[in-house]
């Protein structure tokens, strides 16, 4: 069966998740979840606390191996791959709790992401051989470009330890982009952002998508989710209870009962 179309365009499946299950002892955190992510879209993953969203992210990116199921990224099986191998394949992610190198600047943290595709070896870097010097220069230029894309270039030389919470989260997004992903997974990117910063994040997500990168977000800010998402997947107690465009999700009785609530639907 051909993939559905959107706006008259043929949609290409980039990520295909089938029957993924993850258990921890007697607890089934993710229960037989299947969905597709289409190239060039922004897809949101929502649900109550404990619904299995971050566990599913971990299963997709090699941090937790699912007990059952398949994760195909552009036809490549990701189950069983290490996180670094997943990054090299073209899948990057951020975490719910930011993980920056505190002794480095914002720009240096972003430069770390470029190492996924650098050609230089350890010896070349230690001896400062021409190839290493050139790649360091390219990495700094790329860090500046990505911080401009995110809208925080002025923080490039600021120590990570001194960054406000919202800026730290945006630096982590820039570092993930530095790995040159085709698929970017963001775990609660709006956490710690004020209303102005959240509005800027919305525009950043659109700019990232417009560069050709597909985005999947886990997020509790329903205003942001409804503004940016092409598709929304809803989990509750580890199971998929709904999937579809924002307007459909807002009206789904199961979603309203499990997560959104009547008042939330009226507010978004």
Question: Where do the language-model regions lie?
Answer:
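Glycine-rich phosphate-binding loops of nucleotide-dependent enzymes
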Residues: 2-268
